[in-house]
Amino acid sequence: MLKKQIGDYVEYLLAESTAEAPLWNKEIAGKGKQNKWNYIDGCMIMAVLSMYKNTGKKLYFDAAKNFIDYFVKEDGSIFTYDPKEYNLDNINEARNLFFLYDETGEEKYRKALDLVRSQLDTQPRIKEGNFWHKDIYENQVWLDGLFMAQPFYMTYETKFNKMEGCGDSIKQFKNVVKRMRDEKTGLYYHGYDESRKMYWADPETGKSPNFWLRAMGWFALALVDTCEATSEMLYAEKRFLSDTFRDLVDALIKYQDESGMFWQVVDQGGREGNYLETSGTALIATAILKAVRLDYIPESYAQYGEKAFNGIIDKYFSVSENGEINLGGICLVAGLGGKQHRDGSFEYYISEPVVENESKGVAPFIMAYLEVAAREDINRVPGKE
């Protein structure tokens, strides 16, 4: 039953979407904005291609390819993408080009990969070597950026660049552990300002003040996806990534709600205004189950990923009498600084809109489902009849 429901859900979203106006991108849907090359669509297309790999259904491949082809031109240029914008978020969607290039052999995808990779050659960096999250966020590292850039970076270097930049990628993870991990809890702060000048940054440590769930979900899956992309020849580097991930999971599960889900502000479960959030929970579920499948962490950890996925099913996944499917509990956006006074406080994180059927929740939910399905009878998810 769940298999059919999720298939129907994905196909509905695809049928109601175009590259110009994807239904799953609530930041532009219905607002009259032109769609651009972005990480939100990148995540959804990644999930759609995962559905194709799992089912072999050509509808998924064709939909993903058509979407990407709206942006990627024959000469390898990408409509609306400018490397000199120096926005790490814009790297993420290019991860889909590796698979499309492998499947089709079309040179435009390789040229587009080279174009996106060129951004990293001149992306501004903090003194310790990490990429700035965006050119507009000087001297700042956000956990989000690890997911947006590092799996792409490691994959490109391994496939096309004789592993030249692999050590650089690993060093950036090591700096995050050094600068953004909280020694007391083992959790990671959302952002780090090397200059200590931002109003949200601790003047001593440069860290932002709270543990935002989706940022930790991005980081968790960044560790697993980058580890997967790292050559077996780099044993110590792969071991560092898997050990770091296991340490993170050990910290997170202490804060897992009895429902299986995680809280928007991770360590403050039950505090008034806090809520169980879908996107971060789904990212963590995906990361845990994928890491178990790839033997990065022991089988005993799978229970936490399955419990997280089932928690989402129980609380936020619904099917109406007329068959309409909804996935709720998704934080639309959250960040630090910028034009809005985003100060990283508890009050800030719980103030952002909560929406339904948005890619930042839908995409990792689909990927978590596929990881569960890979473990179990695909027609039945543990705990659900």
Q: What is each model feature region?
A:
Residues 2-40, 59-61, 70, 74-88, ...:
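CBM-like carbohydrate-recognition segments
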